[in-house]
Amino acid sequence: MSKAPDTTSKIAFTNNNTSFDEAGVNFIVNPYDEWYALVRALELKEAQGGNVTVLSVGGADYEQIIRKALAIGADDAVRIDAPESDALSVSTHIANYAKDKGFDLILCGKETINYNGSVVPGMVAELLDMPLVALAAKLDVANGVATCEREVTGGMEVLEVNLPAVISAAKGMAEQRIPNMRGIMAARTKALEVISVENAAASTSVSNYEMPPAKSACKFVDPANAAELITLLHQEAKVI
């Protein structure tokens, strides 16, 4: 599970636009991890039994992210104390932890809403030599087989994969759950496993951040005023 800035937060950069300024930024659990991957894992546990372990790669500031997952219903939580900005490093840490745990299913959000990389699930699957189903909007598990549905151009694709497998969750796999007070109170005192790793530095670095250009103003033209529309398209938009 990963964190992401709340979409209402003001984004700024420091150190000559090489660092993201986290001052005053409210972080949330990445929705694809929380609403879809985590909740569907809990639904499967409730229907079939089992245990749900949440895993995050990041610093101590990830504790609130992990504890929310516990409040929603996860059984165990692990934080790997390492930088989370490099996708390959994150994937390697996840795979190194999971390789001898005997997990039947690894569920990831399809992407984070701040980076939109969509690469960690595939890297984890490759490192663990497991099959991958990406962008699954529906997931059912029975008799050691996961049945997934995902959107394709013009319809839905149905895939079956033998477990263990890695599946990245897209919108539609589950619905958001709000943690209740009992879950919140229990999560506050539940032990977290923190794993320190050697050579945890990211293998890439950010050379520069840039804000997207400001959007141009939108002009509305009365449908009856074709002459004005032609003038605007010619003189301002310069498309005719």
Language-model features: locations:
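N-terminal glycine-rich FAD/FM-binding segment characteristic of electron-transfer flavoproteins
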Residues: 1-240
